[in-house]
Curated annotation (Swiss-Prot):
Gene name linked to the record: panD
Annotated positions of the Pyruvic acid (Ser) modification: 25
Keyword Lyase: yes
Protein name as annotated: Aspartate 1-decarboxylase
Taxonomic source organism: Parabacteroides distasonis (strain ATCC 8503 / DSM 20701 / CIP 104284 / JCM 5825 / NCTC 11152)
Superkingdom as given in the UniProt entry: Bacteria
Length: 116
């Protein structure tokens, strides 16, 4: 039996930009992606701590060290700069493997979006 578990999580990161006229996605600083074991084009779930919105999109790699977290396209309507969000991805795995699996979780500084 396979189950879906949290694979990666960026916990409490600040939205720096919202670009409604882009083709959809979330742009994230490459340092955060590496630390959380996330890659470009990976599907992610977003939770907005400020307004309770929950939605899915995919990742675009942002400039390393920039602290960028930009919601693009329709997702730009779900959060605004300054909002605190959580970014999560999931993986399917065997039930027994899932019992011992440890997700990659990072807790960036919400003022700078840099790793602490």
């Amino acid at each position: 039996m396979f189950i879906e578990v949290v694979k990666s999580k960026i916990h409490r990161v600040t939205v720096t930009e919202a670009n409604l006229n882009y083709i959809g996605s979330i742009t994230i600083d490459e340092d955060l992606l590496d630390a959380a074991n996330l890659i470009a084009n990976e599907k992610v779930s977003i939770v907005n701590n400020n307004n309770g919105e929950r939605f899915e999109t995919y990742i675009i790699k942002g400039e390393r060290g920039s602290g960028v977290v930009c919601l693009n396209g329709a997702a730009a309507r779900k959060a605004q700069p300054g909002d605190i969000i959580i970014v999560m991805s999931y993986a399917m795995m065997d039930f027994e493997e899932a019992k011992t699996f440890k997700p990659s979780v990072v807790f960036p500084d919400t003022a700078t979006n840099k790793l602490i």
